[in-house]
Each structure stands twice: as structure tokens, then as C-alpha cells.
Amino acid sequence: MATIEDIKETALIPFQKHRQLSMHEAEVITLEIIGLLCDSECKDEKTLKYLGRFLTPDMYQDLVDERNLNKRCGYPLCGKSPERIRDPFSMNDTTKKFLLENNPYAYLSHYCSKFHFRCSQFYQVQLSDEALFARTGVHLFEDPEQDKHDIDFKVTLFEELLREKASEEDIKSLISGLKKLGLNPDSGTTEKDDTELEDDLSKWLAQIKIVENDNPSILGDFTRED
């Protein structure tokens, strides 16, 4: 399992003498991070949130794709395999795109469950589009603008949001918030889509309440839905 210290040691140590990264240095950091997590997973939520400092949405998608190539769930907090493992080279891009857009269970080729699919979506839409080399000082272990980095690249995990909103009356407001972030299931959201998402949230919130009473393991251990 990868920790914040692993990320620092693997990707950041060589670049501690200057605040401004070159494009090449930023690419090296990105490749090291993807290499570290393509066949492993983040040890805890804190580590995944720390990664948000260095990732763009496109870089995150590259990480998901690399994890899938290694038969791992795309969500970096998970150590399981996707529910449905497919050979990524068995179809062309057109066929792949068609399946993703028309198969309601296409996410199971990339994630172990719908829950981690939602978690991954929620994480990705919060990532900054700003190039890593433009994020001055974000890679430094000690920087006078650390507090600013914490604010600028702050990421809230879906699991955290559910824990904070763990009551039935908050479901609709949570759905509204997800839509504002562009987290609707498809670009043309329908009433059926809204109902499906609401049902998902109701189910997960109910399981959270059980977790709080029985003190089991983390949310990431949710099994897939039938």
C-alpha cells in the first residue's frame, strides 16, 4: 500500500531545491505517481486526498486506465479487481466508446462496484485542470504557501460526504450537489437516472448507519450491487 511518504520518496525528493517545476520534471512526477499506484493502492483516505495536489482529470483517467490494465479496480483506494475483467485490446476505440455509452453496467469493467465507480467520479471532477508545472511549490515538503495549496487543491471524498450527510432528508440535496459537479450518470439525465442515484444513496446511507453501530471495516469494502 502506498503512503504519503512513499509518494514523497518515489516522486518528489529529486525536486526539493526549487519551487518551479519544468514541464519535464512535472511529467517525471506524474509517471512516478502512476507507476507507484498502477499496481498498488493508497493506504488511507489522507493519501488519496494528498494526491489531488498533483493530478489533473486527464492524469487521473490515465491512472485508472493503468490500474485496469493490471486488473485492479480503478479507484486508487481499492485493492480489488474490476467485477468484469476484459482485455483492453480486444476491441477498437469506437466499440469501446459505444459500450461505455450504452451498457448500463460498463463501469463494472473498470471498478469493483458501483460504489467505487461513484467515488472515482466524485474525486475526478474535483481535480484542477491546471498543469502540474504551473502549480508552483506544490511539490515541496516545506513551502510558505502550504496553506494555500491545501485550499486550492482540496479534495473531498465521496465517502466523507456520505458520512457527513448520513440522513435520509439530505439525499436530495446531495444529488443536487453531485449534478452541479457534473456527476450525473449521463449527459442527458432523466428522471429514471435521478431515481437510480437516489436509490443508490439511500442504500449506501443505510449501510453507513449499520457500520456505525457494528463498527466494521471502511466504506471501501462495499460489495457490488446486483
Curated annotation (Swiss-Prot):
This protein's GO CC annotations: cytoplasm; nucleus
Places the protein is found: Cytoplasm; Nucleus
Outcome when changing residue 73 to S: Loss of function
GO terms of biological process kind: transcription by RNA polymerase II
Catalytic function, reaction form: O-phospho-L-seryl-[protein] + H2O = L-seryl-[protein] + phosphate; O-phospho-L-threonyl-[protein] + H2O = L-threonyl-[protein] + phosphate
Keywords noted in UniProt: Cytoplasm, Hydrolase, Metal-binding, Nucleus, Protein phosphatase, Transcription, Transcription regulation, Zinc, Zinc-finger
Zinc finger (RTR1-type): 50-136
GO molecular function: RNA polymerase core enzyme binding; RNA polymerase II CTD heptapeptide repeat phosphatase activity; zinc ion binding
Disulfide pairings: none
EC top class named in words: hydrolase
Binding residues annotated for Zn(2+), in chain numbering: 73, 78, 112, 116
A Pfam family assignment: RPAP2_Rtr1
EC code: 3.1.3.16
Record's function text: RNA polymerase II subunit B1 C-terminal domain (CTD) phosphatase that dephosphorylates 'Ser-5' of the CTD and regulates RNA polymerase II during the transition from 'Ser-5' to 'Ser-2' phosphorylation.
Similarity comment text for this entry: Belongs to the RPAP2 family.
Subunit structure as annotated in this protein's UniProt entry: Interacts with RPO21.
PANTHER family: RNA POLYMERASE II SUBUNIT B1 CTD PHOSPHATASE RPAP2-RELATED
Miscellaneous comment text of the record: Present with 5480 molecules/cell in log phase SD medium.
Protein name (database record): RNA polymerase II subunit B1 CTD phosphatase RTR1
Naturally occurring in which organism (per UniProt): Saccharomyces cerevisiae (strain ATCC 204508 / S288c)
